[in-house]
A protein has these predicted regions:
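N-terminal "arm"/small-domain region of PLP-dependent enzymes with the aminotransferase-like
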Residues: 1-26, 31
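Phosphate-binding glycine-rich loop
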Residues: 26-73, 87-91, 97-99, 160
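PLP-dependent aminotransferase-like
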Residues: 64-149, 156
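Conserved active-site segment immediately N-terminal to the catalytic lysine
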Residues: 147-180
Length: 193
């Protein structure tokens, strides 16, 4: 039996929109991108959204925007796509890997003993992490939270969409994610970075 990795389902309306964009707009950016950014920001519940090339790019850009750099210590869980830790190394910062909850695969803040300059919790497999424990830790240490919501489009934590409940939320639309749009990603923010 052949089991597809993902199923491509395109409506005629979707195909027409792609062709219209290719024929009438610039290849990168343009009216469709601006419209998507605005609509996705409204959907998530943030004021700002910026399209970038990948989830890794969104995470990387968020670290720069928050002023993190060499020798910053940034907490992230062990159970994630490599981009969560790679973006930290890309700015010459130190990833502090922490354990996860066995039950849901998300970050276990009880395993964090180190102080840090930021934290990147990951909402894994569309399942929000225990964000209250993340927020308490961040507030106690006065550090920013960058949500890796690359696998959690539309997931909610206490009636709020993930990606909107921290300083910055990062999403990926890679074809293997639970929501795909060619190869683009979004960086969400409540404040102008």
């Amino acid at each position: 039996m052949k089991i597809p990795f993902f199923i491509q389902e395109f409506t005629q309306e979707m195909e027409n929109a792609v062709l219209d964009t290719l024929r009438n707009e610039q290849f990168v950016g343009g009216e469709s991108v601006s419209k998507f950014e605005d609509e996705f920001a409204k959907y998530i519940g943030t004021k700002y959204a910026v399209s970038v090339s990948s989830g890794n790019g969104a995470l990387h850009l968020s670290l720069f925007a928050l002023g993190l750099s060499d020798n910053s210590k940034i907490i992230t869980p062990t159970n994630s796509f490599i981009a969560s830790a790679n973006c930290i190394r890309m700015i010459n910062a130190k990833p502090i890997l922490c354990d996860i909850h066995y039950e849901d695969g998300n970050i276990d803040m009880n395993s964090v003993n180190d102080s840090a300059d930021a934290i990147i919790p990951v909402h894994i497999y569309g399942n929000p992490c225990d964000f209250d424990s993340v927020r308490i830790f961040a507030e106690e240490h006065k550090i920013p939270i960058i949500e890796d919501a690359c696998q959690a489009h539309g997931a909610e934590y206490k009636n709020k969409k993930v990606g909107s409940i921290s300083d910055v939320g990062c999403f990926s639309f890679y074809p293997t994610k639970n929501r795909s749009e060619e190869h683009t990603s979004e960086l969400q923010s409540r404040a102008y970075l």
